[in-house]
Structure formats: C-alpha cells, structure tokens
UniProtKB/Swiss-Prot annotation:
Pfam families: ALO (PF04030), FAD_binding_4 (PF01565). Residues 108-279 form the FAD-binding PCMH-type domain. The lineage of its organism: Eukaryota, Viridiplantae, Streptophyta, Embryophyta, Tracheophyta. It is found in: Mitochondrion membrane. Involved in the biosynthesis of ascorbic acid. Uses L-galactono-1,4-lactone as substrate, but not L-gulono-1,4-lactone, D-galactono-1,4-lactone, D-gulono-1,4-lactone, D-erythronic-1,4-lactone, D-xylonic-1,4-lactone, L-mannono-1,4-lactone, D-galactonic acid, D-glucuronic acid or D-gluconic acid. FAD, NAD, NADP and O(2) cannot act as electron acceptor. Inhibited by sulfhydryl-modifying agents such as N-ethylmaleimide, monoiodoacetic acid and p-hydroxymercuribenzoic acid. No inhibition by riboflavin and lycorine. It is a single-pass membrane protein. Residues 16-51 are annotated as: Disordered. Its cofactor is FAD. Keywords: Membrane, Mitochondrion, Oxidoreductase, Transit peptide, Transmembrane, Transmembrane helix. The FAD-binding PCMH-type domain does not bind FAD covalently. This is L-galactono-1,4-lactone dehydrogenase, mitochondrial. PANTHER family: D-ARABINONO-1,4-LACTONE OXIDASE (PTHR43762:SF1), L-GULONOLACTONE OXIDASE (PTHR43762).
Length: 600
C-alpha cells in the first residue's frame, strides 16, 4: 500500500439540507391566538348591544391581520417569476483556495493550514526559514506524513521537502551517498543500486523521506544493527538563528549527535550524508513457533541472524518467526517448495469470513457492515480479509480472538523461504489504517541477553487475556543495537547493549466516525494498561513517531518528568533556544513534551 502525505486543496462543501421547521411562524404583524379554554357553563343571556361590541372587536382583529399581511407582502416583493423558480438548497461559501488539509496516512491526525511551503532548492529553503524567523511565522518540518502520531503537523504552518529529492553525490569506494533530505527511502535505494549500494537497514515501509526517518529515530530489526539515525555521518541543517550549518562527528560532534534525532526542532534537515553497505540478496525464512520454544533458542536467534523479528498472535500460543540472512554464494536458496498454496493458506480465513458475514447479517439486518455490495473475497489479500473480518465487530474480544486464530492458521500454512534484495525482503505489510504504540527498552547485550524482552511479552499477553482486550494481531517485537544519538530511545554509551522494540496495534477498518471513535477509545485504554503495568518496570519509552500527548494536565506533567529521566531535555531545549529562539520549527506536540521556561 502506498502511504504518502495526504495533501489536498479544500473544495466547496454543501451545507446539509435545512431541517424541517418545528412549527409554523406567523408573518410580520400577525398574532398567535392561544387555544380556547374548555367551554364554561352556559352564561345568562346578554343584551344585543354587548353582542355588537364583541363583533366589532374581533372584526378589528381580523382587519389588522389582513392589513399587516398585505403590508408585509408589498414591502418585500418577489420577482414576477419567483413562483416559477425551483427552490435552491442553501450552501456554505466555499473554503479558501489556499487552505490545505494535511493528514497522516492513518487518518488519525489532521490539520488545515494556509501556510504550506514546498521549496525546490536549498536557497529557497534558506530564504523561507529566514523570513519565517524574522516574522515569527511557524513552519514546522513535515515529511511524508507517515508518523502515526502526526508529529510533523501544525495548523500554524509547515515546510515539506518533497521537491528537494535529489541524489547529490555518490562515493562508491567509501560507500557513502549525499542526498537532499526530501528524497524517499525507496527512491534513494533505486537510485544507488547501480553503484551496488543500499542502506544498512530498513523500517517496515519505504515511503518515508530521509529527513523524517532519521529525525524520529526510526529503526529496522537486527540485534547487531543500530537504528537508522546511526547511518547518518553528516548533515546540513538550516536553522532560524544561525543560518545553514554543517554537522558531523568531526564538526561540532555534540550538536551533530543531538540533531540526528532532533524531532525537527533544531533546524530543517536539508541534506544528509549516509554510510551505505553493499547491495545484497537476503534469504527470508518464515516459520511458526511458540513462546516456550523461543525461550530455548532466543539467544541463538538473536546472535546468528542478521535480521530477526517475532510476531505474536494474541489469544493463541502462535509466534511467527521471521529471519533474514545474506544468501550463501555457495549453497544459494533452499530448493524446498512450500507445502501449501496461497489459496490453501487463505482458505481458513475465507471460511471464517463467510461464516461471520451470515452471522452478523442475521443479528442485525440494518447494520451497514457487511456491505451488500461485497467484493469477491477470492480477490482480497490476507491483510484485506483481516480488515474486513475485524470491521464486523472490532471491539468484541471473542470475535477478534477468532480472527486471530484464523490468522494463526494462515501463518502455519505460509511457512517457507523467500529470496530478494534487502529493500524488497525487509518490508512488511502493516495492514490498513491503525492506531499503534511502540516502546523501546534495554534487553541486555548480544552476548548475554537479559530475557526481559520475552518476560515483557508474557506479561503483555496475560494482561490482554485478563482485561479481555480485543487485541488484534500482531504484537510485533524487533531488536536493534544501541544509538549514539542522545534523543534516541535506544541511546546507550555501551557498545554491546541491545534494545527490544514492541508494538501493539488496533486497526481502523471502517470509515464510520462513531465506530472509529469507539476503536480509538478502546486502543487508548489498551495503551494505558500497558503503560501502567509495564513501562516503568522495564524502563520502556515510546517511539517518537508514536507517542501521544495526554489530555489530562497531571498525566502530561508526569510524562514530561518521565522523559527528563531518560533524555537530555535541558540540553535539547538549550539547543532549541540557540538555534530557534522564536520556536518557528515547533508545534503543539514538541511544546508540550519539552516546555521551554520563559525565564531561561
């Protein structure tokens, strides 16, 4: 699925048809006559003069009403052809043409702004930043909009480098490449493959801009491999207060390491120099195991595989293990053929969908899902089928458990090998729109894993069962080496340290606003439970692209204090004051996570 920044001009929108009137109003000059009371006992006979008096009174009322109506009509005359015109539905005035709507790919965060900038050259960017600094106009750096928490979004204004996407220099001998920060990962990989080069590691998807992927501390998997910011050996930063500065480990190393994972708050990353590796084919092996079996082999799995990840399926004992290693030049790929075809692997999932579709139609024939115009399920991929199954009853833990069991069967029949280039193999189909939370915590060293990574998973699965959380699959667990960037969740001064990254998820498989809100509420309940039970115990901190800002003031203060225990917040804010004193590169999220004292 192509996930890219959703940027669109707002179009004219129609107002809903006017509501039917609740009551008929009188025209100007008319009076509302109250309902007559119940008839009283017959009065004694009255004189004829009294009757005439009453008649004249009511005749006067009638004349007044007629006169008022006529006056109203002639005071506000309609055109002669008015009665022949069709009624027109009232419409709102169209929104301004320069109003841009920008959202992240999950549709969970969205802003509208008139100030959306896309410079084409470094000179354009420098002029933009200089002007914004002088006028104190906010221009928050935003990449491809893939961050689940919308960390790059700002109503006040944004700058996007999608038009600055060139490869500037390739050093084949040193395996280095210098690029503009707006280039997408896949675009870069395609451009340098002719030099026999590629990136050391990849995240799950390829549509991120290079500037964005390093600024939020993104990562791939492999206990010997660091997060992606460690591939950066030089960068050009356009700052509001000091102009364009070049940073490397030899040129202001302290600021260089701080800015590599700088959350877009220290300057706009304009150019990046990356240390690459030789392009190589990988052999991917996917198989099914259990947590008990993994405990016996965990140390070996981490140390002998270049890339490894576990995908846990809640409400089952199934763990999908995926390892990736360079293809041996001598033996090549295994010749074993898969035991099952794709059709056979999907059969159990399709059968559950057919069964569920009938069940939910019987239970509620008025329900909008499933749609009467269902697509041919034989044309749907596994992740598409999973989305449609979950959409039937996303908050029912029993139903979601059945979907997970069907997924376990799918993976058991999908075991096997696959060979491809690293940028093809290391990707992962994350499914449709979703809420996700991912934490990072220390897991010992490669030589001596602490096993706390597996303990974390055990407690998480027990929590899901105990609280009856409708937790879909997968719980994804990956590993990286340490990062030397102080703002990285995987920062460490010890070279041998390894870190585990665990992601939980809830899909948003529907466009219905009420259902999406219900799923959102349930996800944040799920996330809150993991936070309360696990984060402090394991020193776990959220991925910067997945952290969410609490609405409660006390919870926000607790989060700010917690971040101070792990990250050099004072040093980060000091650099912000020096490089961006007017905080034009900030947004609401950065301001709340790292409040800057006005007296500092």
């Amino acid at each position: 699925m192509l996930r890219s920044l959703l940027l669109r001009r707002s179009n004219a929108r129609s107002l809903r048809p006017p509501f039917p009137p609740l009551r008929t109003l009188c025209t100007s000059g008319q009076t509302l006559t109250p309902a007559p009371p119940p008839p009283p006992p017959p009065p004694p006979p009255i004189s004829s003069s009294a009757s005439e008096k009453e008649f004249r009174k009511y005749a006067g009322y009638a004349a007044l009403a007629l006169f008022s109506g006529a006056a109203t009509y002639f005071s506000f005359p309609f055109p002669e052809n008015a009665k022949h015109k069709k009624a027109q539905i009232f419409r709102y005035a169209p929104l301004p043409e320069d109003l841009h709507t920008v959202s992240n790919w999950s549709g969970t965060h969205e802003v509208q702004t008139r100030n959306f900038n896309q410079p084409e050259t470094l000179a354009d960017l420098e002029a933009l930043v200089k002007e914004a600094h002088e006028k104190k106009n906010r221009i928050r750096p935003v990449g491809s909009g893939l961050s689940p928490n919308g960390i790059g979004l700002s109503r006040s204004g944004m700058v996007n480098l999608a038009l600055m996407d060139k490869v500037l220099e390739v050093d084949k001998e040193k395996k280095r490449v210098r690029v503009q920060a707006g280039i997408r990962v896949q675009q870069l990989v395609d451009a340098i493959q002719e030099y026999g080069l590629t990136l050391q590691n990849f995240a799950s998807i390829r549509e991120q801009q290079i500037g964005g992927i390093i600024q939020v501390g993104a990562h791939g998997t492999g206990a010997r491999l660091p997060p992606i910011d460690e591939q950066v050996i030089g960068m050009k930063l356009v700052t509001p207060a000091k102009g364009t500065i070049e940073l490397s480990k030899d040129n202001d190393p302290e600021l260089f390491h701080l800015a590599r994972c700088g959350l877009g708050g220290l300057g706009v990353v304009a150019e990046v120099t990356l240390q690459c590796v030789e392009r190589q084919e990988l052999l991917e092996h996917t198989y099914v195991s259990t947590l008990e079996e993994i405990k016996k082999n965990h140390k070996k799995l981490l140390s002998t595989n270049k890339h490894v990840k576990y995908l846990y399926i809640p409400y089952t004992d199934t763990v999908v293990v995926v390892t990736c290693n360079p293809v041996s030049k001598w033996s090549g790929a295994p010749k074993d053929k898969p035991k099952y075809t794709t059709e056979e692997a999907l059969k159990h999932v399709r059968d559950l969908y057919r069964e569920s579709i009938v069940k939910y139609r019987v239970q509620d024939s008025s329900k909008k899902t499933p749609d009467s115009r269902e697509p041919d399920i034989n044309e749907l991929s596994f992740t598409e089928l999973r989305d449609k199954l979950i959409a039937l009853d996303p908050l029912n833990d029993v139903h979601v458990g059945k979907v997970n069991q069907a997924e376990a069967e799918f993976w058991k029949k999908s075991e096997g090998y696959r060979v491809g280039w690293s940028d093809e193999i290391l990707g992962f189909d994350c499914g449709g729109q979703q809420w996700v939370s991912e934490t990072c915590f220390p897991a010992g060293t490669l030589a001596k894993p602490s096993m706390k990574d597996l303990e974390y998973i055990e407690q998480l699965k027990e929590l899901i069962q105990k609280e009856a959380i409708p937790a879909p699959s997968p719980i994804e667990q990956r590993w990286t080496g340490r990062s030397k960037s102080p703002m990285s969740p995987a920062f460490s001064t010890a070279e041998e340290d390894i870190f585990s990254w665990v992601g939980i998820i809830m899909y948003l498989p529907t466009a219905d606003p009420r259902q999406r809100k219900d799923i959102t509420d349930e996800f944040f309940h799920y996330r809150h439970l993991t936070q309360a039970k696990l984060w402090d115990q394991y020193s776990a901190y959220e991925h910067w692209a997945k952290i969410e800002i609490p609405k409660d003031k006390e919870e926000l203060e607790a989060l700010q204090e917690r971040l101070r225990k792990r990250f050099p917040v004072d040093a980060y804010n000091k650099a912000r004051r020096e490089l961006d004193p007017n905080r034009i590169l900030s947004n609401n999220m950065v301001e709340k996570l790292f409040p800057v004292s006005k007296t500092a």
